[in-house]
Amino acid sequence: MPDVFLSPPAPGGPVVVIPTYNESGTIGAVVEQVLGLDGRFCVLVVDDGSPDGTGDLVDALRRRHPARVGLLRRAGKLGLGTAYLDGFRHARDAGFAFICEMDADFSHNPDDLPRLVDACRPAEDGGRGADVAIGSRYIDGLRVLNWPLGRLVLSYGAGVYTRAITRLPLQDVTAGFKCFRREVLAAIDFSRVRSNGYSFQIEMNYRAWTLGFEIVEVPIVFTERSEGESKMSGAIVREAMRKVWELRARALVGKL
């Protein structure tokens, strides 16, 4: 089927980009909960050819909510980073004012989305005036449920490692629950984004920060997925370790 995209139903509306691969157990409920927040939120799912029928489930939701659900089907498992970039590109070019990202497995609570969007609204509209809002697991104490100790140490250690090398002033550098103002994604040259695993989150934060955008962290509770399989792997960790040094080196020589 052709890709089905979206346009903002109203000025200033937010869209949530959700990448999927074999998320049929949760994606329907996640999308429905986002749509139930209020009439502002749209959803764009980027599916990497899931063999479990995730794309077909989303297409059924799209037919029920044609003005608020979009679907981008990709040919195969092409990676988290490129999935987000493809979704961001459409959302940015379509004119959505606020572009969010989140996981498809309820590790991020959709009910927290309005707080992220509000953090990016101008102060005169009751917001904090930030350019990027991160749903942070570490900004206000430790807020992670059901993670094994090893995974927690790995995640927290990634933050220490990244801050030491890049000076990025964030507690949760690898968080995948965010809201960007459209202007941020318009300023970042997607063709220069080289990360494709979880280091993608670090790279997007670093690029936004070095461009002078304000990033704030909003405390959330992260709950480890209860269905499906984690996409974390040793290769993803190794990529992240390399990419942090690469980002810093390129920034130092003016070739970020």
Question: Predicted segments — roles?
Answer:
Residues 1-13, 167-168, 191-256:
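Hydrophobic helical membrane-anchoring modules
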Residues 1-33:
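N-proximal low-complexity "stem/linker" segments adjacent to membrane-targeting elements
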Residues 18, 40-50, 72-73, 102:
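Short beta-strand/loop segment that forms part of the nucleotide-sugar
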Residues 25-29, 52-61:
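Acidic helix N-cap motif at the loop->helix transition within catalytic regions
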Residues 27, 87, 105, 181, ...:
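Residue-level signature of catalytic and energy-coupling elements of molecular machines
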Residues 32-41:
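Short, acidic, metal-binding catalytic loop of nucleotide-sugar glycosyltransferases
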Residues 47-56, 106:
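A conserved acidic beta->alpha catalytic loop
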Residues 74-93, 98, 110-198, 225-235, ...:
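Acceptor/aglycone-binding surface of glycosyltransferases and processive sugar-polymer synthases
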